[in-house]
């Protein structure tokens, strides 16, 4: 299998990013299932200049609390009006140190660093990931077309590095962690899923409606 491009674009919005803040007085969990991007690598030499990018629209981030969502998206926090998306771009892989190959069905652990773009600020962050190649078969076809790559990536988001901590009110200091934990769980495929736009809209509306019912229950 030569150098291959995998597309992160699940029309069923089953990919996910979870951001957690665990402070002395409060735990906040922020989630989105709207993730798009690309992963390009050589399965026989994963560390040989892989290219990874993904982004999430800030408006899709959800705490489960409407008022908290409004605050989070405002100019004192993520400033969605001026910077509507958060982007991550892999810079380099530092581990494994030598050539490493992906074996179908086996998980490979990698470490590296990438650039996180947030609020108009770009910062380098260390990243750890688990990568699994899933060959094309009847089971994977029920999820996505083509070869499938499952990536679980984790990194930290220090608020001070993105000038967010300075906006926190004194009474918020025990409710928001200074460093947030981010986990992206993504399935990418060599073939782009073909779903009519009206179906995408119905799926998005159904997910939004379900989320609202769960919050109100």
Give the location of each predicted region.
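Low-complexity, acidic/polar, glycine-enriched regions of mature
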Residues: 1-217
């Amino acid at each position: 299998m030569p150098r291959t491009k995998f597309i992160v674009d699940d029309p069923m919005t089953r990919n996910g990013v979870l951001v957690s803040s665990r402070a002395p007085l409060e735990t906040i969990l922020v989630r989105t299932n709207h993730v798009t991007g690309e992963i390009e690598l050589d399965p026989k030499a994963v560390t040989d200049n892989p290219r990874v990018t993904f982004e999430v629209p800030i408006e899709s981030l959800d705490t489960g609390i409407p008022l908290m969502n409004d605050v989070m998206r405002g100019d004192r926090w993520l400033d969605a009006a001026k910077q509507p998306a958060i982007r991550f771009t892999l810079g380099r892989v530092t581990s494994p140190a030598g050539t490493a190959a992906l074996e179908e069905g086996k998980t490979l652990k990698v470490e590296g660093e990438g650039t996180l773009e947030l609020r108009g600020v770009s910062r380098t962050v260390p990243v750890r990931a688990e990568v699994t190649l899933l060959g094309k078969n009847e089971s994977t076809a029920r999820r996505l077309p083509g070869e499938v790559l499952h990536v679980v990536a984790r990194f930290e988001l220090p608020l001070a590095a993105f000038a967010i901590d300075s906006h926190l009110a004194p009474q918020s200091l025990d409710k928001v962690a200074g460093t947030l934990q981010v986990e992206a769980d993504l399935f990418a495929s060599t073939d782009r899923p073909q779903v009519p736009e009206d179906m995408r809209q119905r799926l998005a509306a159904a997910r939004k409606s379900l989320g609202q019912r769960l919050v109100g229950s």
